[in-house]
Amino acid sequence: MYLRFSLMGFKLKEQFYFHLGELIKFNSVNASALKGKPFGEQIDLCLDKVLEIAKDIGFKVYKDRDGYYGFADIGQGDELIGILAHIDIVDAGNVSNWHSNPFKLEFRDGKVYARGVLDDKGPLMAVLYAFKLLALEGIFFKKRFRVIFGTDEETAWRCIEKYKIREEIPDFSFTPDGDFPVVNAEKGLLQFDVISDERFCMNFELGTGYNVIPDECSFELGDSNKDDFRILLDSFGSKIRYKFFESNVLIHGTSAHASLPELGVNVAPYALNIIKSLGVKANFINFFEDKIGFTINGEKLFGRALEDSQSGQLTLCLTKVKLSKTSKQILSFDMRYPVSCQREELVALIKQTLNLYALDYHEVSFLDPLYVDSGSNFIESLIEVYENFTGESDVSPIAIGGATYSRAFKNCVAFGPLFKDSDNTAHKTNEYIDESELMNLISIYKNAIKKLNA
């Protein structure tokens, strides 16, 4: 990696990890609203804690009157530069599959493990400590900087929508929630349900969120022959793992962010294949087998793999399944589509296909694609910081499938935290970040803030 110098003494490093641990301990998954706590108790407590930490560092802090967001200001001047990060996390899933407590920092083999340590609490704390180090150096902030703490990034972005109504929009912004060197293009996001009114013979659920590749499901054995079940599971190959218990079988894949399905092993297609093998007949199963199957690029649904040079190939994943004896059957999908595609045209094609199977389409959420001119002074400044830090040259912005806060404001891009050789463990079981990379983040964000302050 690129660690050029010892950025912090032992005491500051100790403080950094203490403060990061103070955020990690909150299971800040979106939950039922309470008065003044629109996304639940844990997110609200985490927001209070990060504001407390920012205040101790020297920021002037503010919490939205309804609890939707908070921010921390430092500096003066007319221009406002924003840094957007989020304190909410995706569900840790079955914690017994973690090697350590997901809500406590675990240091092992040069890595730091915890839910949110990469996405996005670790990078957020790196930003705050970048400001702390600059303040210790005595730098004068002649521009206004605002670190905005989002609370609903992993679900519906209601926090940022509320912010945009009530607060000043930064002139330029970056979010530490993507990749280096700079992300100036993000695929469009479409999350939707395929719904069937068919009666079904069993209750079955898998998946925790639209943007998480599901890595676990369970089947009750009932009168099924265990040997026959084992033969079927073995026919799937070594990508999945399974374990028999007295009355059920537990099947494991590999979790991943839904924007990067190739990094995971999705148990959902295997589950529907198993259900069909049990003799179950249903239109939604036929649809999935005919138009999705084990593909991740939508080519069976749209007739070809859709892609462009700016942002790459479309991805389409089944991320949740909810089957019921007493209500409707629901298949939930996450789709990331190229910046050159039109969402309305894709939706029309999906609906047209679903009609053939007597299935209904329900749109859950969408985000339009992002594309920011790579020649802007702001992007060039961030590229320069990256090149100076890494020693690389002739670096160009990149595109990703993830949906970051870059789409929230005009002139906003993602800047880290992933380097080109980083392991992307976001949304995975045993999420981690290399300790050296975490220290590198403090360095590079410190340099970027200093450059933007010039």
Predicted regions: what they are:
Residues 2-85, 89-93, 330-332, 346, ...:
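N-terminal helical capping/dimerization or prosegment-like subdomains
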Residues 12-15, 19-26, 49-57, 133, ...:
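Generic non-transmembrane alpha-helical segments
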Residues 61-65, 242-244, 318, 398:
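Short beta-strand
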Residues 80-149, 155, 429-440:
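Active-site metal-coordination/substrate-binding segment of hydrolases
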Residues 154, 160-338:
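Midchain, well-structured core segments that form catalytic/ion-binding scaffolds
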Residues 259-325, 336-341, 345-348, 360-454:
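An extended, acidic, His-containing surface patch that forms the Zn2+-binding/catalytic region
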